[in-house]
């Protein structure tokens, strides 16, 4: 039982949490990978295959940078969900070594994968709040989401917006 032992913690922390943290970092920087298929993801949580990647200029939540991604599968706003999907694909490949009983292996893998959403949200909230010079909270999340809406409405450059905000000095 790989997932009922200490290896479960390794998988959770070292694969799921690193993937969540990596994609939260991308989102916080306005980075669009472009080709997040499973063979372009590393279990160590590092970015590879910089083919059609880009830093977002004018903010558009559904921005795509791969010329073949007509459906928007790897769009900016899809990256967190694709990260989770890729982890599910990895878990599916590992089912035979998780538990000999397939149903039990699926149950154990699902238990691990349920932590992805909260892990991503935590790191993303911390990164977004930090970009505004705040601690992560419901209020900082609301403020950041409102800022993204303004950025999208006016097609503001992702990086330049935060540089400009940083230059504001309050007495």
Regions found by a protein language model. Give the residues of each.
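Single conserved hydrophobic/aromatic residue that forms the stacking wall/gate
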Residues: 1-7, 11
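Protein kinase catalytic-loop region centered on the HRD/HxD motif
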Residues: 25, 30
């Amino acid at each position: 039982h790989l997932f009922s032992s200490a290896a479960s913690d390794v998988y959770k922390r070292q694969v799921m949490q690193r993937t969540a943290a990596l994609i939260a970092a991308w989102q916080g920087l306005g980075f669009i990978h472009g080709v997040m298929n499973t063979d372009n993801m590393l279990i160590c949580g590092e970015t590879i295959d910089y083919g059609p990647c880009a830093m977002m200029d004018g903010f558009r939540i559904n921005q795509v940078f791969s010329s073949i991604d007509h459906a928007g599968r790897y769009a900016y706003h899809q990256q967190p969900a694709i990260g989770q999907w890729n982890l599910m694909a990895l878990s599916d490949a590992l089912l035979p070594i998780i538990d000999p009983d397939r149903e039990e292996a699926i149950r154990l893998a699902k238990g691990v994968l349920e932590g992805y959403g909260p892990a991503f949200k935590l790191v993303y909230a911390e990164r977004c709040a930090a970009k505004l010079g705040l601690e992560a909270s419901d209020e900082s999340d609301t403020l950041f989401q409102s800022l993204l809406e303004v950025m999208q409405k006016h097609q503001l450059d992702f990086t330049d917006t935060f540089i400009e905000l940083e230059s504001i000095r309050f007495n």
